[in-house]
Amino acid sequence: MQRSHELFERARQHIVGGVNSPVRAFTGVGGEPPFIARAEGPYLYDEDGNRYVDYVCSWGPMVAGHAHPKVVRAVQAAAADGLSFGAPTEVEIRMAEKLKAMLPSLERVRMVNSGTEATMSALRLARGHTGREKIIKFRGCYHGHVDALLVQAGSGALTLGIPGSPGVPAAVVEQTITLPYNDAEAVRECFQRMGDEIAAVIVEPVAGNMNCVPPVPGFLEALRECCDDHGSVLIFDEVMTGFRVGVQCAQGRYGITPDLTCLGKVIGGGMPVGAFGGKAQIMADLAPEGPVYQAGTLSGNPVAMAAGLATLALVDDPATHRALEEATATLVDGLRERAEAAGVSVSLNQAGSMFGLFFTDQNPVTTFEQVQACDLEAFKVFFHAMLEEGVYMAPSAFEAGFLSTAHDTPAIEYTLAAAERAFARVARR
């Protein structure tokens, strides 16, 4: 990949680490990243002319595949009318109406520019609404690079082996309580000790930043029960799971209604966007109606709203999500069969069109500790073998994989043929 190598060398002269988000630098797997020139459907094409079946999907947003004609046309039409106004527009109303129609828990909505902004703002709102300061998060869950939440985080922080981050004052995180994910009893014990001090519980209902770890039965129910009993705000970070694991996101899939929901990724169709919303009584505390301040220069950007609306229209259908889930199951089952045939121990998880591959003999994988104990060296061998075969998976053992509606039978069959050879390489190492 000569051209990609040259671009990476050039990037490192001007951009910190050569990338604008750490995981893209391949720190977790070694080697150098391909630089992408374009994408279409389920495929990426790099600067050296190589084609890859893409299971990163821009880290989740591209649920309808890359460069979907309807999304592209919507963006072109919106851009022709102006890129940003800093003033109210009809399209942001339409987006709010669409989100509320698809997700009944959203009584009121506020658009922002990223998932990090959404979680940061939701936490501030929960603290302002309750008058409390303590928050609960879970080990291995990542909610963006918010100071108060960058504690035992997943995603890139986990890939780089950073349990927290320099630059985050101890005073900022001393009100953050970190508990084990999928441990309902630990949550109940914490609430028994200090429930009346807890402003909010924030959780990824499917943990997608320590690979893909769905909730065990009873875990989300315990969060809802404890928050109800103590007047705390339950926040679902559905930035990743939103419209990924079902028409009504993870909350619809598992039947648990949060007080606030954070969204991003899919609702922008590939454009920078985020949103948070929930109970009208809580959202009423947000400026300009209430005292909790939040603002953004580009919030509700008309081009991002147009891309998001076009994308949501493509997946606002239970049949579409069933087909996505079936395609993902075909991939997951095929990977499991080929690993077993090669004599390689793996465990696979799935939630909708998200999946996780773990090199371990523990099955199922349900905890952060199990994820940390996986064979990272085996993953590195598998990752590079797949990349050489033309399959682009997340360059970290701690990131989930994704499918899109564009991942058809030929793409999946190609992937499984490549995986058969990749697992054989893992077995020989």
From Swiss-Prot:
Cell compartment(s), UniProt: Cytoplasm
Major location category of this protein: cytoplasm
Superkingdom of the organism of origin: Bacteria
Top enzyme category: isomerase
Cofactor: pyridoxal 5'-phosphate
Family stated for the protein in its record: Belongs to the class-III pyridoxal-phosphate-dependent aminotransferase family. HemL subfamily.
Name assigned to this protein: Glutamate-1-semialdehyde 2,1-aminomutase
Organism: Alkalilimnicola ehrlichii (strain ATCC BAA-1101 / DSM 17681 / MLHE-1)
Gene: hemL
